[in-house]
């Protein structure tokens, strides 16, 4: 092997990165033999952006979607699990309302921490180093919840709350990571559908939790039927319920264990990895630009099959005259300041401190905040809706748990599940912004109807409005608030900005549960009114938040069928580095020429 070939092999090995599996292909290594980092970046990203939808993308959806499956499974399971564990750990099967709220809010508190923390870390340390750690946190916390108990030295509720906060941190970390990784590995044409399908795993998680709960209730039916109430739940009944809630919550970590290998072996995102490589090579004094429209898919195939191939191009003269075929890329002097600045807190504040950029972050964060406030509003009506369809949860312990599981399954399949998948099939056709705006508009109208006409609505009327709200919540802002932040920000801040947006959403959910949720009984006892007497006014407040979400969504740009680099260039004024080529890289047909020479067309 000649010295030149030895050098080429060494350079190729130096450019290769670790990782890669059946779900996330290592695109960087496909072009490791390309010496120019800018050209290597261009070819790798072009292959990702122009790829046809295939089983590779389906596997990526499954691996990235596991976190959201676990998230929704856990939230649904804890609602059913609390109903089970109340008979075991609290007298008469009555859990204090403050304790119940604490258990349910604790996950959201942890989620906020995870969203902010992991979002920043993924931009600082890289996607590969972080992805999988949040799933390990989720799995570990899930297992710990299943084995805790009560003793004179340990408060059961406090310990369970602690592990739910820990689990929330893992769940929160999955939001920015799964979003941006899916976004950066997806083909441009179907990126919205792929990201929406990842998020739609939430619906499958809810359905799975309902099915597991129903199977457990039927499996322990003989132990539960004899108990007509919490006071008559004997030792065998309590033992059955204690086993049931532990199995129900513990089953949530099974999908995560299966997907953990794929997350830990993921390659670094080509966009992040190659951008960091460019930052390290910023000592290059000038760059040369490729003629737009050249070096297409055929070039990728030729370069992969023959590392030493030189791509012939037909150049267009600046004045329209054809200059014929050329064996070298066309190069034009370009100032180095086109390279995006290095990520830092100072640059982050400077960039988003400008309204034309900051309004996008404000838009994604505040729309998510408004949405999550109102999502809790739908949950306030669940008991009324279940009663309307005959699943009020009255009667024996068995009947209560059975009705709760079946009733919630009906509501999920009636509204949430179709809504998610309508978004998957239409988001790359209709666009993100129209779906988000229309969803907020419909939710505003529906909440107004429920709020201002609440006492004139029958149970069936509420059921219809509830299903419409569930449908347009998911065929609307619930999906798009997750999707848009994963696309609309530049690579160096994509994870951080997504984490901030998602964190603001969960803060909205916490406020709704702790503050607005208590308003439903405002003045009820004092004025001798029935329970939930102020629910109609609370729904009116939620309608206002939906209107604010609609108005704020106008600040967010459309990203349909645009590459991530085109989005950054259009909305953040950042020139795509892939358009340039370092002048220090010698052309294969003129290797003896000085590396600092730049030819201008």
Language-model features: where?
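Transmembrane-helix signature of 12-pass secondary carriers
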Residues: 2-601
